[in-house]
């Protein structure tokens, strides 16, 4: 530590140069002699002090360390003393007392707690007392700020912690070193099958602890667009060459040739892709290739049978993704549950041959009822049919009445099934019509009558298009026709 000492002060004259002494001051003045200016520096090393003197400050700073070096070089090295049964650790000057307290507490697994015990004094000159507890040890410190009081408290408790006996030496458990499995012998002839020959050759040389292979380009030959490169590889006293359309392929071929020379198995080389595209050749089909396709031509006697099969698949495909709550798509199982298969249908829903003339008449009656509310065609049919009973005449405004009138004229049944109200407080009804083909629809409304009217209107629209099914509707599997959506 350097400590500058004040230099010798100059001796000043007591003579005043002012004009107060008289109008004519003396012409000559002889001041007292002034000694030369000296600087002194004090250097502390351990418990010893060394002084340096000089006329200028920089040389004095160098003089004090020089004297300290001359003195300390002749002294023997100090022995390391043991304090409390342990070697004294070198004190770190950059480490504060608070850090030392936390370090000791961490080693001994002790809790540390700092708290301000009390404050005193006026607001502009407060005095703080901080208490620190480290396990069972307690210390207090006082200061003009919380930081100073905390530091003094740590200093007080640090003296108590240093008196503790040393920690017992804990024997460290030696970690078990897991034996590594014996690595694959990279020098075996079968090692590296399918690996890049360049990497394989390098790994083999590393396993042998020999020098890695050296590659060198020998020549380039051929036309600019048909270049051929010749690469040479050297492993020890063995050399091999490889040719390729580019340097990478040539290097690979050279490595493969070197592996063959060294006695390693090399897979068969695959043909490289040509630089220029060749003309595509039409593949020649061998007998027996492909799938067999059989064509059937209907005979005149089978026309009725084929028409029946076609009619079984004539059915509009309507998505049931927008069905309301409680309505299921009309799959065969659901159709059996609601009774669609009763009547003219069997259990497997094989449909009887429909009558095109009857479908045309049904569509005509449905259109007349939709547009006019009355149907002269239905009235004529009902008059000719004695078993139909008395049917009231006049226009019919409700779709449910129109559908009932049509069912009486064409001889099919209409059945409604009501469901409980949904989460929107709406009624839902399902209608089942045993026409050809059977039709199923649903209706939604505020009451049951409006649900029946909506469902009947959907069925009437489908019936009015029966004569157009053969040309407009796609063919799907057997089953009843379902009409979805709100009208």
Swiss-Prot record:
Q: Which InterPro entries match?
A: DRBM-containing_protein, dsRBD_dom, STAU1_DSRM_3, Staufen_C
Recorded hits in CDD domains, A to Z, give: DSRM_STAU1_rpt3, DSRM_STAU1_rpt4
Establish whether keyword Disulfide bond is in the entry: no
Q: What is its main location?
A: cytoplasm
Subcellular compartments = Cytoplasm; Rough endoplasmic reticulum
Question: What Pfam families does the annotation carry?
Answer: dsrm (PF00035), Staufen_C (PF16482)
| Region ranges (Disordered) | 175-196, 270-310
GO molecular function per UniProt: RNA binding
Domain (DRBM) spans 96-163, 196-264
Q: Name one GO biological process term.
A: dendritic transport of messenger ribonucleoprotein complex
Annotated Gene Ontology cellular components are: cytoplasmic stress granule; dendrite; neuron projection; ribonucleoprotein complex; rough endoplasmic reticulum
Which residues does this entry mark as bearing Omega-N-methylarginine? 27
Which UniProt keywords are listed? Cytoplasm, Endoplasmic reticulum, Methylation, Repeat, RNA-binding
**Its function?**
Binds double-stranded RNA (regardless of the sequence) and tubulin. May play a role in specific positioning of mRNAs at given sites in the cell by cross-linking cytoskeletal and RNA components, and in stimulating their translation at the site.
Its subunit composition reads: Binds tubulin. Identified in a mRNP complex, at least composed of DHX9, DDX3X, ELAVL1, HNRNPU, IGF2BP1, ILF3, PABPC1, PCBP2, PTBP2, STAU1, STAU2, SYNCRIP and YBX1. Binds with low affinity single-stranded RNA or DNA homopolymers. Interacts with CASC3 in an RNA-dependent manner.
* Domain remarks in the Swiss-Prot or TrEMBL record: One of the DRDB could be involved in RER binding.
User: What protein name applies here?
Assistant: Double-stranded RNA-binding protein Staufen homolog 1
Source organism of the structure: Mus musculus
User: Taxonomic lineage of this organism?
Assistant: Eukaryota, Metazoa, Chordata, Craniata, Vertebrata
